[in-house]
Swiss-Prot record:
The active site is at C45. GO terms for biological process: cell redox homeostasis; cellular response to oxidative stress. The keyword Disulfide bond applies. GO terms for cellular component: cytoplasm. Belongs to the peroxiredoxin family. BCP/PrxQ subfamily. It is an enzyme of class 1 (oxidoreductase). Its EC number is 1.11.1.24. The active site is a conserved redox-active cysteine residue, the peroxidatic cysteine (C(P)), which makes the nucleophilic attack on the peroxide substrate. The peroxide oxidizes the C(P)-SH to cysteine sulfenic acid (C(P)-SOH), which then reacts with another cysteine residue, the resolving cysteine (C(R)), to form a disulfide bridge. The disulfide is subsequently reduced by an appropriate electron donor to complete the catalytic cycle. In this atypical 2-Cys peroxiredoxin, C(R) is present in the same subunit to form an intramolecular disulfide. This is Peroxiredoxin Bcp. Thiol-specific peroxidase that catalyzes the reduction of hydrogen peroxide and organic hydroperoxides to water and alcohols, respectively. Plays a role in cell protection against oxidative stress by detoxifying peroxides and as sensor of hydrogen peroxide-mediated signaling events.
Amino acid sequence: MTIEIGQKAPDLELKGDHGETVKLSDYKGKYIVLYFYPKDMTPGCTTEACDFRDSHESFAELDAVIIGVSPDSQEKHGKFKEKHNLPFLLLVDDEHKLAEAFDVWKLKKNFGKEYMGIERSTFLIDKEGRLIKEWRKVKVKDHVAEALQTLKDMSEK
């Protein structure tokens, strides 16, 4: 079953990039910008992560935390964060539990080869833990700016 707008976000336990156990409910009282990306250190994923990094303060001013999610290991996340000075949490979803709950673990095709992987997507979760906005099949260019503007518009209401 896939989460839909207005529903509570799944509260699964995952490992953070420092080995800590993390649940989305740990951030109740804040907006969560939850973004799923395919793989650390790849061009599109690096661009997206750096765009979120560069807008991190603007999101924080709106009482939002940014959380990235991929199947990569804690060690790979650590190297990725260090190399690109990422100031936000990266979650290890090596069993694809959170990706499946948000329906972003998909059959993909590249150069004629089929495989399972993350469909780049972002979800905005409100301060009570409910999904309020989703962006699926994200194109990296201008995505972070759009997500930030959406949050600004919502917080002005």
